[in-house]
């Protein structure tokens, strides 16, 4: 009967371990969510446990040092972003979970940056906003748009969460718009507002499909073409004018040309053989401001291809060279002794190097003797 005792001990130990595991991992009530400011100090109580209760603290499953405790409370100094996490307090002997805190470290919001722009005039405009610095915790924004005393609907952008769209109800209105935005989070609140006239926020998107090409046989010309921005809804009724800038890559200074109409321009003063960068901006003909610059186009003016001599072109020169090589040099004359009045019979010609003037005089004398 002595043998079953060890087995009984093992069973008791296993049951005890199961109880401890169940106590540490059994479902508990949702942790308390707490927000604290970056750089501050915080004291986390262990639920309803007495101050002198023997407890152990863990964060995200890792034990914390005992020197961080003040009794049963956990004290954290100079909070950093890395302090965010799930803090749990256990009874030191039984490992019974006493309390949980989900700590978020962040900042209150600063005054938001708000701007409005009409790139689809005269259909409407949009407003967008952002915080100048991150808060590291969730923020809630609320936007209000007034046209005079009338509240306008601001439809949320389907893709950009910090943007909404407003449709113009009355074109060419002299009544100002006022857009207000407030932002809040668990640590604070802030707000701002802007007021503007309809025409002051008109700003088209940049021109599209900017292309630059060399002009054949013109080493100083580049032909530039572009398209009106596709977001501009009615270019016939609300025409755009354009501003073109260009420069060779070797220089930093831009040259500018303002164009009242059309979507093409020929640059006539380009440096031959130098690569150029070209950009175009757009603006409503009467109101608003210039768009941002378009995507840059690059091009190099036409250059003449170097001419390479062909075999056919070289042939006449070879013939001429061969013929001239057979001619006597200026100071050399091929003479026949018979021509010099030697009286002998025909013989092979031989070379006599004499000055040209002497050779001509000798030839003249020979001719006179033959006439006599």
From Swiss-Prot:
BP GO terms, sorted: ciliary neurotrophic factor-mediated signaling pathway; positive regulation of cell population proliferation
Propeptide feature: residues: 343-372
Domain called Ig-like C2-type: residue spans: 27-104
Main location: membrane
A single GO molecular function term of this UniProt record: interleukin-11 binding
Membrane topology reported for the UniProt record: Lipid-anchor; GPI-anchor
Annotated lipid attachment (GPI-anchor amidated serine): 342
InterPro entries with a match to the protein in the record: FN3_dom, FN3_sf, Hematopoietin_rcpt_L_F3_CS, Ig-like_dom, Ig-like_dom_sf, Ig-like_fold, Ig_sub, Ig_sub2
KW Nucleotide-binding (keyword) present: no
Pfam families: fn3 (PF00041)
Domain Fibronectin type-III: 108-205, 206-306
Compositional bias segments (type: Low complexity): 311-326
Keywords, in A-Z order: Cell membrane, Disulfide bond, Glycoprotein, GPI-anchor, Immunoglobulin domain, Lipoprotein, Membrane, Receptor, Repeat, Signal
Chain residue ranges for the region called Disordered: 301-340
Localization: Cell membrane
The organism's place on the tree of life at top rank: Eukaryota
Segment forming the signal sequence: 1-22
Cellular component GO terms held in the UniProt record: ciliary neurotrophic factor receptor complex; CNTFR-CLCF1 complex; external side of plasma membrane
Family indicated by similarity: Belongs to the type I cytokine receptor family. Type 3 subfamily.
Domain comment, as recorded: The WSXWS motif appears to be necessary for proper protein folding and thereby efficient intracellular transport and cell-surface receptor binding.
Subunit structure: Forms a heterotrimer with LIFR and IL6ST. Interacts with heterodimeric neurotropic cytokine composed of CLCF1/CLC and CRLF1/CLF-1. Either alone or in complex with the heterodimer CLCF1-CRLF1 interacts with SORL1; this interaction may promote internalization and lysosomal degradation.
Function summary: Binds to CNTF. The alpha subunit provides the receptor specificity.
Protein name: Ciliary neurotrophic factor receptor subunit alpha
Organism: Canis lupus familiaris (Dog)
Source species taxonomy: Eukaryota, Metazoa, Chordata, Craniata, Vertebrata
């Amino acid at each position: 009967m002595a043998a079953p005792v060890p087995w009984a001990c093992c069973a008791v130990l296993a049951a005890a371990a199961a109880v401890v595991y169940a106590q540490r991992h059994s479902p508990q009530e949702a942790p308390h969510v707490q927000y604290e400011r970056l750089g501050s100090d915080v004291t986390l109580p262990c639920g309803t446990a007495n101050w002198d209760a023997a407890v152990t603290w863990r964060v995200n499953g890792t034990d914390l040092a005992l020197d961080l405790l003040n009794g049963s409370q956990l004290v954290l100094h100079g909070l950093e972003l890395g302090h965010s996490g799930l803090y749990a307090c256990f009874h030191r002997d039984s490992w019974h979970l006493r309390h949980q805190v989900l700590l978020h470290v962040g900042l209150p919001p600063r005054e938001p940056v708000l701007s409005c722009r009409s790139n689809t005039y005269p259909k409407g405009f949009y407003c967008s906003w952002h915080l100048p610095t991150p808060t590291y915790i969730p923020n809630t924004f609320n936007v209000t748009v007034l046209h005079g005393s009338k509240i306008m609907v601001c439809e949320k952008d389907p893709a950009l969460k910090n943007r909404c769209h407003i449709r113009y109800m009355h074109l060419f209105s002299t009544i100002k718009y006022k857009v207000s935005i407030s932002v809040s989070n668990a640590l604070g609140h802030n707000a701002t507002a802007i007021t503007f006239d309809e025409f002051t926020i008109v700003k088209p998107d940049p021109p599209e499909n900017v292309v630059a090409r060399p002009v054949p046989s013109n080493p100083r010309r580049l032909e530039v073409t572009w398209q009106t921005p596709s977001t501009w809804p009615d270019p016939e009724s609300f025409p755009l004018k354009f501003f073109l800038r260009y420069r060779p890559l070797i220089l930093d200074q831009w040259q500018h040309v303002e164009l009242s109409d059309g979507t093409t321009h020929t640059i006539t003063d380009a440096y031959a053989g130098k690569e150029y960068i070209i950009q175009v901006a757009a603006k409503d003909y009467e109101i608003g401001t210039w768009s941002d610059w378009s995507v840059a186009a690059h091009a190099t003016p036409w250059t003449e291809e170097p001419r390479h001599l062909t075999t056919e072109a070289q042939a006449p020169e070879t013939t001429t060279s061969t013929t001239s090589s057979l001619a006597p040099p200026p100071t050399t004359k091929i003479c026949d002794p018979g021509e010099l009045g030697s009286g002998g019979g025909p013989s092979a010609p031989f070379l006599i190097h004499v000055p040209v003037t002497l050779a001509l005089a000798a030839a003249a004398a020979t001719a006179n003797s033959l006439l006599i």
